[in-house]
Amino acid sequence: AKYLKAIGALRGGQLVEVTRADLVGRYVGHTAPLTNSVIQSALGGVLFIDEAYALYRGGEDSFGLEAIDTLVKGIEDHRDDLVVILAGYTKEMQLFLSANSGLASRFPNQIEFPDYSGEELYKILCSIAKGKGYTLDDACKLPLVTYFDRKQVEDAATNGNGRMARNTLEKAILNQSKRLVADPDASLELLLPGDFELE
């Protein structure tokens, strides 16, 4: 948002990040005002809707459809003063964009980011570990890369890419603390292959 402001594409530099819970009301008549309020707060900046596909849960979801209809109108009415970014998994986003005939045409630019490779996830895990004060034994690399590659093939959509790396590290840190109870002289910073649960 700041870069778009810097080049003059937007008058404001704010980023408003929301999910379904921020756009869909719990009662009849609450969704449109809620969605309009979010749009108003983003004017001049960027509205980022994470997991946007959650707005559409099928034809029976009248609240979600109302939020989508309100968004479409808001996007059209403020097309010169608002950038809207929708994020989500490819398959779910395709279904979402078909929920309203005007929705897909308002998002002509679609960018699909490929899933991380096992090597990239390993580097992400190492970076997170370093930020927490941990290092990985060199023997961790091959099993972790192999594990991440296998998990990505099985189902990248539910693994969450970077989230999978973080969760794997958090389990390893917990396992390391259990190991240190039995071996208090071991390094507090070093994670070993046995600390990782690579089912």
Descriptions of predicted regions:
Residues I7-L10, L95-S98, A104, F113-T158, ...:
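Conserved C-terminal "switch" segment of AAA+ ATPases
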Residues R20-T31, A54-L65, Q110-P114:
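Flexible beta-alpha connector loops of hexameric P-loop NTPases
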Residues Y53-A104:
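Conserved catalytic/switch belt of AAA+ P-loop NTPases
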Residues A1-G13, S37-L43, F107:
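Walker A/P-loop
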Residues D22-V24, Y53-L55, Y89-Q94, D115-L121:
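Conserved nucleotide-binding/hydrolysis micro-motifs of P-loop NTPases
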